[in-house]
Amino acid sequence: MPLIDKLRERISRAFYSHGLLCASYPIPIIILTALCILASCYPLLKLPLPGTGPVEYVTSVKDYSPPPLEPNPEDHSDQPDWYVGLPVAFIQQVLVKAVVSPWDKDFLAVDVFRSPLSRVFPLVEEIRNHVLRDKSQEKSLEDVCLQVTDLLPGLKKFRDKLPEHGCLLLSPANFWQNSQEQFSSDPDLIRTIHQHEPKTLQTSATLKDLLFGVPGKQSGVSLYNRKRIVSYTVTIALRRYNATFLDSLRSRLKRQHPSTNSSAASQHIVHVHFKEEIGIAELIPLVTTYIILFAYIYFSTRKIDLVKSKWGLALAAVVTVLSSLLMSVGLCTLFGLTPTLNGGEIFPYLVVVIGLENVLVLTKSVVSTPVDLEVKLRIAQGLRNESWFIMKNMATELGIILIGYFTLVPAIQEFCLFAVVGLVSDFFLQMFFFTTVLSIDIRRMELADLNKRIPAEACIPPPKPGAKRYDRQPTLRPATPHTITLQSLRNLRLPKRLRLVYFFARTRLAQRIIMAGTVVWIGILVYTDPAGLRNYLTVHVTEQSPLGGAVMPPIPVPVLSASNPHGPLSAVFPTGSSQLLENQSQRDSKEVIDSLSSRIWEESHPEDKSKERAAKIEDKAHTQVTWGAEDEETWRKLSFRHWPTLFSYYNITLAKKYISILPMIPVTLYLTPQEVSDARHPQEAQHSHPYLQREGKPDEAWARVEAKGAEKPTENQTPADVTLYKVAALGLASGIFLVLFFFLLYRLLCPKNYGQNGVSHGRRKKGDLPCDDYGYSPPETEIVPLVLRGHHMDIECLASDKMLLVSCCLAGQIRVWDAQSGDCLTIIPKPSLRRESSGVFEYQDNWEPTPECKYNPEESLENGYQLKRRTLHPPLFSDQPDLTSLIDTNFSEQPANEESGARQRLSCIKQESPPIGYDFSSLVQKVYEEHEVSSFGSFPLVLSPAPYGQCQLSSGRRSQTPAGCVDGSCARRKSSTEETTGYCNGSSSPAPSWTDSFESSVWSLGLQGNLIVVGRSNGNLEVWDAIEGSLRCSNCDGQSGITSLVFLNHRVVVARLNGSMDFYCLDSQKSSNQLQFRGAPNRSNVPSSPLYSTDDVIGCQRTHTVACAHRKPITALKAAAGRLVTGSQDHTVRIYRLEDACCLFTLQGHSGGITAIYIDETMVLASGGQDGAICLWDVLTGSRVSHMFGHRGDVTSLLCTASCVISSGLDDVISIWDRSTAIKLYSIQQDLGCGSSLGLISDNLLVTGGLGCVSFWDVGYGDLLQTVYLGKCEDSQPARHILVLDNSAIVCDFGSELSLVYVPSVLEKLD
């Protein structure tokens, strides 16, 4: 077993055991969880309610004056309301950057910061002693600074570190009481600086941050400081603003400690206003969010039937989320983490989102389990189903947090610390508290259901003991199977609120969005934060990488002389470092001219150049101090609690007040190696290791390179620095990481078969509860369908038009049904005929056939018997007019005539009527004049082809009896109320008779109005009257079987087996009488197709013939929107114009024969073939729009909606595709043999067939809405074909029977 599977199995087993534990002992677990919550929230008792971050307002330094005490109502500027009166203090910071230059390889790691820190004492003394001498007075720092008194009583440990009873001036010198002697005698500076640091994690202001004035990681006080630059500030709090004094102090410090490449462009004063710490109003959005959360969960769970207490579950969810927030903040406070502006405000809302989604996931998983299981098993199974996904999401989130923490960006690290605590606490509460509460609620639901099911007798108290009575007790009724009705079920489609809930629970969209947003946020901060990766790489490359190298000459950079750092600038040309271009642009013109002149002088004196290079062996590398825009507002990198914490030590509150932060004063200090040696403590040489000894001593490499450069001064050598290679490797690693990250994100968000094989859940089976994604099994019901019986063989063809349904079986019998009542209206041929195995009809009695053609009309007409097959020969009197319409065939009250058929017929014609009888002369004369060919029993109807292939039959009154076949001739049997005459114009060549048609199979069928068009295997095309069962027209020109036909309006197009097509037009010689067939009695449905009267003479005129439409048999034929589309075994699809049979396009795109075609009035064309592919085509241009592979066999049927394409195949799979993107949305696995049984009731409702059942699906969502079983399922047959009627009914083909099923009304309303 693979490692992943083993891990997954162990996780599932652990969650299953945990679910059993929570459901078995709910009360102890809830009590234990409550104690854990209270213990975690205990630190919150000492924490005030969180306020909001400070607000800033910026003004210019030039002409600054403090605002008035009261706001001016006439002032319409944009200054805030709080900007009134003097601030609590004006903060002036002197930012110091100190570096040892040049650096010697023998220096210790502690030398990086000991000597720079030693310079803070004279700097502080210089600031304290600065005096501004004016004409009339002198002003010192004591006159303008903020005077403070004692510290708070609880800060005794800070008494010797923070100033008291004097100016509020802070610097690193406060660690040693501003005494340089204590500093020099301190053997361990790191221990002294960190002795008051909290042992726990801390993000708020610490003593080190207060005194250094910069974040601890940027101070450079570390044994592994590769930059060798130490930064700290001297912070001065001023009581009033004196611009003259501050300008003089700035000028003096710049003069004494010049910062040559510092722009100091900031000329603004930032006023920072701090809101009230306890802000109840600030908590209103968060409280509102939790109220909305409670209401949303309640209204969502109202639609979940398996939850007993909706209020209780919603309350438990809110308590879970709120407890998770409180536990997170409490644990963070316990470990020294306090919410800050960046992480604290959004954190409660992230907890709400993540907690809500986890609640939905657990609820959905548990209520999706089978209801017949025990409660603890349901809880355990629900947890097991979601265990892998919960742990996978948890691991992904922790991995992202871990990566973010090691970016070393303070804001990201702080957020990651909060996120870890929040995720762990939320996971704890979800697993222990909410799961246990959910088990209690489901157990209450189960008990309530049991109480409802207890019979009334069980509630009767037991009788009192007394005399035994032996009366007969009534037997209990056995449990009988019941039918689930739609009224007792929940809504077939889930409500929108639950669909949204389960959508978030199924996809975990919120957590994935948060994870993606966190990654993007971390990436942005890494590359934009002043302390981020971008600045690190810039400084690192600037300090150690030779830009240009051998490609371009090194640009001279002026630096301070090592012997005299305070003296004038001298041009020194370091070969091991280059200056940033922006720093070079900041030099004055004099420096550039001096550099260029020095360069020219060096080129003209190569001997001096060699000497200078030899001297640089000792001066290994100068570290240049750079100043950037991020240094102008270093205070922004501090915690927003920095200033309130500082002033709170002196009992000064900043709530509802503001402070003004002045532009900083830059100071650059360069320390010589001699100063480093003088400041070193004797004990440090024994305990400290050389600088960067563990990192490979890069300075030795520099020394070797410089030595080689001195030996070969004529060669342009570049120091062997690998920083560029490190940067390149880091960039390559970042690129690989991004590629892998986006790949994993793709695999996480997108399914494995995205764009090819549909969604990840694959095929949906009815047995596997296809609605499991939403937690519900589809409702099932059983109804008694309207069964249409009558066929003795399997049904092969089905057709419908409005209220009529036509079916044809393999025996060639055509039946016309009423789609509303299920009554059989007409049988073609008549029900008294049946076909032998050879295909010819015979009598159903036992009279013996004779080898000769003899016929007794009275006997046949009276008894309605069928003839057996006899030898075909020309009938008698075939050249005489048919006078059968003159015979009264109502023999029910007359004795049968025993004479022979031929003599009786002749005597009936020649017999003169009695004087008192009826005169038939006028009627006989009319018959002779019309020259109609007899269609009576033994007289053949010669259907010779006309010059244009026209053949006509005229029917008289309405037929009541079916037609029969005698001796190979087609005839119709009449009653007294009917007379029929036949007419066929054309040549005298014999044509096939009706019996020939009956002996051939029906290959295709079409119905429109009251006309049925039949295409037979022998090539004959017949038009029948669906109501009377009479043949209205027949065309016998075809020599090849009709594989398919289209009956559209008055046009009939037939496709033949040899690949040809014939276009016919149906017309009538009389005006059409648009009768309205109303189906069965008491029906009022009117079909839209034209209905012809029995008096109409229907003509079938062939208008066009396409001799070679395809090179192989035509297997598919569809017509719509004036276009005719054909598909053939030659792998092509052709589009014809219906009106003139003109071929417009030949479409090639299949590698197999075409098996299915779909086209509608919107000219949407789809084709499917034996290769299992589906192609979508543009009918107007003939181009292929999309190509989809979705079946392992032939595509049997195609359907299209406005947004989907539905295909089915021989693999018994129904695939639903997105029409615009050609992406498979989902698949439906059908029962064996039911792959092609599907139909569209509407664009949103699909019906499919199964073993003795039909199922209704939501096309848009793939939900199984309902399964309807048609009778018993033990001996059920597969539904092979489904035909959707216009009256909200469907017809299912179950072998030789048809089942008429009406769509449930709930589904109609749903659609």
UniProtKB/Swiss-Prot annotation:
Cytoplasmic side: 1-18, 299-310, 364-399, 443-512, 745-1311
Location of this chain's protein in the cell: Endoplasmic reticulum membrane; Golgi apparatus membrane; Cytoplasmic vesicle, COPII-coated vesicle membrane
Transmembrane segments: 19-39, 278-298, 311-331, 343-363, 400-420, 422-442, 513-533, 724-744
WD repeats: 790-827, 997-1034, 1037-1076, 1109-1146, 1149-1187, 1190-1227, 1230-1267
Domain SSD as annotated: residue spans: 282-440
Organism: Xenopus laevis
Residues of this chain annotated as glycosylated in UniProt: N242, N261, N583, N651
Swiss-Prot/TrEMBL keywords: Cholesterol metabolism, Cytoplasmic vesicle, Endoplasmic reticulum, Glycoprotein, Golgi apparatus, Lipid metabolism, Lipid-binding, Membrane, Repeat, Steroid metabolism, Sterol metabolism, Transmembrane, Transmembrane helix, WD repeat
Protein family (similarity comment): Belongs to the WD repeat SCAP family.
Protein name from the UniProt record: Sterol regulatory element-binding protein cleavage-activating protein
Chain residue ranges for the region called Interaction with srebf: 747-1311
InterPro entries: Beta-prop_SCAP, HMGCR/SNAP/NPC1-like_SSD, SCAP, SCAP_N, SSD, WD40/YVTN_repeat-like_dom_sf, WD40_repeat_CS, WD40_repeat_dom_sf
Domain topic, free-text comment: Loop-1 binds to loop-7, enabling interaction with COPII-coated vesicles. When levels of cholesterol in the endoplasmic reticulum increase, Loop-1 binds to cholesterol instead, thereby disrupting direct binding between the two loops and preventing the SCAP-SREBP complex from exiting the endoplasmic reticulum.
Disulfide bond entries: none
